[in-house]
């Protein structure tokens, strides 16, 4: 927990996985120099100004993410963090007043750090129930304010980012990770439609392009298998309900 509330004064927000950087991953700070990569646009404090600019430019939709750890700081609390819920409600209300439709990512590589340390990276079935609790909370909280949802951002990168020489065990772990996320995603779709039949809930696939090394048929077929496992597999499961690929290795 940020005992000093973080330099950005984010109340009640525990660390998430993306914030756990190894030593040396951040640049040293030097007095008098400006580092925009450290604070980016600081949307937390400037969302009203940012949304006003989006309205001025004529934008009709704005995609953003809800941070799981801002709603359930460790992922296992019985009650959500009200300050986190209020922040997103204020953002969505501001968007509605500006005539901008929010498109919300429910999970964007931001598993609460406490869950990661306790259960590993989506390698325990307990994640499914915890994710269900999280999505139930936000679907209820923002009913009428948010209609368009994405369950998992770039879910297929679990496979895409494996090295070419990954072992069968690494593939087995990656597919187990995906399986739990597929189940959690399906449950989120069910829950979301039960809470609000007007909800539109989809998936987000990272569009990575693969090219064959040569025109040799074996290279063409290998390239096709990369497309199937890296792109189509995750899309087919979530869009068609088809689980077609069973081989754990490339």
What do the PLM-derived regions correspond to, one by one?
Residues 51-57, 62-108, 192:
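Aromatic-lined substrate-binding rim segments of carbohydrate-active enzymes
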Residues 38-48, 79-87, 124-133:
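Glycine-rich anion/phosphate-binding loops
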Residues 250:
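DNA major-groove recognition helix of helix-turn-helix/homeodomain DNA-binding modules
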Residues 1-21, 31, 75, 92-247:
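Active-site region of glycoside hydrolase catalytic domains
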Residues 1-71, 75-78:
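N-terminal structural segment of carbohydrate-active enzymes
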């Amino acid at each position: 927990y940020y005992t000093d509330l973080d330099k950005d004064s984010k109340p009640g927000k525990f660390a998430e996985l993306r914030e756990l950087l190894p030593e040396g991953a951040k640049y040293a700070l030097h007095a008098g120099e400006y580092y925009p990569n450290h604070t980016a646009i600081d949307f937390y404090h400037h969302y009203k100004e940012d949304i006003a600019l989006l309205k001025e430019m004529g934008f009709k939709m704005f995609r953003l993410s809800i941070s799981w750890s801002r709603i359930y700081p460790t992922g296992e609390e019985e009650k959500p963090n009200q300050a986190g819920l209020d922040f997103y409600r204020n953002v969505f209300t501001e968007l509605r007043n500006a005539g901008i439709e929010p498109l919300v990512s429910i999970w964007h590589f931001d598993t609460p750090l406490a869950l990661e340390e306790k259960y590993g990276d989506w390698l325990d079935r307990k994640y499914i129930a915890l994710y269900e609790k999280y999505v139930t909370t936000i679907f209820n909280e923002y009913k009428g304010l948010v209609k368009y949802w994405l369950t998992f951002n770039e879910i297929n990168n679990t496979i895409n980012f494996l090295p070419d020489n990954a072992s069968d065990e690494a593939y087995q772990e990656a597919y187990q990770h995906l399986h739990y996320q597929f189940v959690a995603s399906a449950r989120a779709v069910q829950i979301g439609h039960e809470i609000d039949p007007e909800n539109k809930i989809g998936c987000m696939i990272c569009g990575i392009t693969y090219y064959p090394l040569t025109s040799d048929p074996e290279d063409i077929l290998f390239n096709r298998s990369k497309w199937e496992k890296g792109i189509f597999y995750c899309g087919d499961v979530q869009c068609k309900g088809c689980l077609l690929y069973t081989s754990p290795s490339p």
